[in-house]
């Protein structure tokens, strides 16, 4: 699998608010997947944001490996999967990061303001694409 930096066409696909699925590792070792929002930061890391009470935050603290598959909304056959590791977990005290994600995906700030949120930054170790994102 290729390693970063991402080619321009792959970076462009990941920059869109595409549907995505995040994979974590349950404490008993089995994979757990969930739909999620994400943003690619200027430094190439992936920003995720979680409700602080969610089990996947515990999964990430115990096993910092993450996979994320972003599916091109216009053609689900075209997708990019990244595998990486959590390099930072921080409280999203003022809900700045979840608002950024919510605006990216829906155009408005995140409506739920009374629950603690946590931001997770993932550094990409390697990636692969399929469909129009496939690299030979």
Model-found features: residue ranges?
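Extreme N-terminal tail/first-helix region
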Residues: 1-17
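Charged, gly/pro-rich active-site loop segments
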Residues: 1-5, 77-136
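Residues at secondary-structure transition points
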Residues: 4-8, 51, 55, 113
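Short, surface-exposed beta-strand-loop junctions and turns on beta-sheet-rich folds
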Residues: 54-56, 75, 136
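Non-catalytic surface loops within mature trypsin-like serine protease
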Residues: 42, 52, 72, 88, ...
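Short beta-strand segments
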Residues: 17-52, 66-70, 81
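A short beta-turn/loop motif at secondary-structure boundaries
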Residues: 28-30, 72-76, 114
């Amino acid at each position: 699998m290729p390693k970063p930096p991402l080619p321009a066409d792959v970076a462009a696909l990941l920059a869109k608010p595409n549907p995505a699925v995040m994979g974590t590792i349950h404490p008993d070792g089995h994979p757990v997947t969930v739909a999620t929002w994400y943003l690619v930061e200027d430094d190439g890391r992936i920003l995720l944001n979680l409700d602080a009470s969610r089990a996947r935050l515990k999964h990430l603290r115990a096993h910092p490996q993450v996979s994320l598959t972003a599916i091109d909304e216009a053609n689900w056959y075209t997708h990019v999967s990244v595998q990486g590791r959590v390099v930072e977990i921080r409280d999203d005290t003022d809900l700045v990061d979840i608002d950024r994600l919510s605006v990216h995906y829906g155009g408005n700030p995140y409506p739920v303001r009374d629950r603690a949120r946590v931001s997770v930054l993932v550094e990409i170790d390697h990636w692969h694409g399929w469909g129009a994102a496939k690299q030979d």
